Amino acid sequence: MGVRDQNLEALGAMYATFNIKQTASVDDLKDIDIGKAVTITSGYQVGPCTDNSVFLGKLVDLTLTDAENGKRVATIQIKGVMTVSITTTNPVVGNRVVGGASGTVKQAPALGASDPAGGNIARGTVIAVNGTTDCTIVM
């Protein structure tokens, strides 16, 4: 009898709903972005992760359709086990992550003088890495 594949992403998931950041009255998150990493952009508002942003969680759903700008809300997985796309510098198992470009995450920078007054921006713990494609994180 072989070892069963584990569906860790079903463990301890917590979801929250946020408004979507807009640029020129157009939502910054679209259906194509489902599954990407997101960051908090202002009070109760999210957008795609950008370089060195704080990784909030994974976009799992959007209400309505892409055509209904300003009326949609985003459901974000903010806790539990999740898999998201990665970019350079790729994290390794045991690392923490920060936002990368275009809705990805990357290895968190070393602690130091660059940390903001509010604290270190690194989040989660990487528990698996799939080459240079994605990583699985527990938050």
Describe these PLM feature segments.
Residues 1-139:
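Surface-exposed, low-hydrophobicity beta-strand/loop segments enriched in small/polar/acidic residues
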